[in-house]
Amino acid sequence: MRTSYLLLFTLCLLLSEMASGDNFLTGLGHRSDHYNCVRSGGQCLYSACPIYTKIQGTCYQGKAKCCK
């Protein structure tokens, strides 16, 4: 009986984490914006882009800029 309560508690914790929006099933097949930036030859910066580079997108869920 104690084992079933432990399993139920674990399942509830897992489902509550998944309800936050960024769960495992919606994340399948999606790459992070940081990965896409670096793969395309850019770099993620929190400050302004250096001279002779342009903003190509965002990184870290919109908190930084992808400079290329």
Curated annotation (Swiss-Prot):
Stated name of the protein: Beta-defensin 1
GO molecular function: CCR6 chemokine receptor binding; identical protein binding
Signal peptide span: 1-21
Gene, per the UniProt record: DEFB1
Keywords: Antibiotic, Antimicrobial, Defensin, Disulfide bond, Membrane, Secreted, Signal
A GO cellular component annotation in the UniProt record: membrane
Protein role: Has bactericidal activity. May act as a ligand for C-C chemokine receptor CCR6. Positively regulates the sperm motility and bactericidal activity in a CCR6-dependent manner. Binds to CCR6 and triggers Ca2+ mobilization in the sperm which is important for its motility.
SUPFAM superfamilies assigned: Defensin-like
Domain of life from the UniProt record: Eukaryota
